[in-house]
Amino acid sequence: AGGAGGLFGAGGTGGHGGFADSSFGGVGAAGGAGGLFGAGGEGGRGGHSLVAGGDGGAGGNAGMLALGAAGGAGGIGGDGGTLTAGGIGGAGGAGGNAGLLFGSGGSGGAGGFGFADGGQGGPGGNAGTVFGSGGAGGNGGVGQGFAGGIGGAGGTPGLIGNGGNGGNGGASAVTGGNGGIGGTGVLIGNGGNGGSGGIGAGKAGVGGVSGLLLGLDGFNAPASTSPLHTLQQNVLNVVNEPFQTLTGRPLIGNGANGTPGTGADGGAGGWLFGNGGNGGSGATGTNGGDGGDGGAGGIFFGTGGTGGAGGVGTTGTGGDGGAGGAAFLMGSGGNGGSGGAGLTAGGDGGDGGNAGSFFGAAGTGGAGASTKAGGTGGTGGNGGLFANGGAGGSGGLGGDAGTCLFYTSPSPRDRG
């Protein structure tokens, strides 16, 4: 695990899990806890494996007066060769929790790509109790053989702040992963968007309900049984309509998620507050389509949307992951999307979004896909006045796939 920070120091980054060719990849270590004013450290990424990728480490919790950090990305399940189910992607690490009173939670790590099942996205960290937004859940990993990974759940905000967006479900030719659940607002703030379902009939996650006094429900939130809450939502929708029509973003509310499989960009968050929408995943094709960029966060507070994952290239190159959306004044940048797998070359990871000018964590770059020619990891976002820059994404492994005619993949419940 990463070392704990001093009074003003950030916690250390957790070590990365090791590579394994015939067993489970190593688990990434947790990031260190921050000092009193320090941010938590980044979780380490899980190790690659031909059987099952290691899980990413959790982001370290921040000091009492500081910010959380992002969870490590899940390890990539290796190719088991021809006529085989192949490997299972590792789960993304949980985002670190913010300080006691202020600060946003860290984003969950993305689930790893698996030639059998994609890894589950990590849950977003929780914000400080007074002010701050919940961290975004990580995107589920692509599952080429069976099921895409489930998107991570969005974190819980403070009294003032938005619930974290749920991560998008991973794509699959068989069964797409379901989107993650959006975080619920407390007093003032929007509920987080439910993550979009992955290509392959994945279902959208349930959106979070807004704060008690002011805020808009997240995408795919359940219908309210309270007449007062329903009236509040109807009034806000009427107020938002001219802003949305004239400027392309609401006054209060989250941006819309990009449609899965189109590479559409996520919408921008509200002029006052709101999270950016998640970018849509890229299309599967001869060459995979690029993932959409995450939408920008709201002006006063709001988290940038997570970039969409690049599409799978069936005979060519994988698509590049979309860039994470930038925050403006107070909020965390979105994580970049993972590059898509391709037969000849993996896609590059998307760049992480920039942190807010005053408070918030910078987004982590997306991981490059592993294939004959591994993709390049995305660049981490720029930090704000009181935040470090985001970590760069890991590059994909390169090399020809082997042949293993009788190999069978273990089921997820046999992984221990």
Language-model features, listed with the residues they occupy:
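Short, solvent-exposed linear patches
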Residues: 1-4, 28-33, 57-61, 92-98, ...
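Low-complexity repetitive segments in secreted/extracellular proteins
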Residues: 15, 21, 39-42, 57, ...
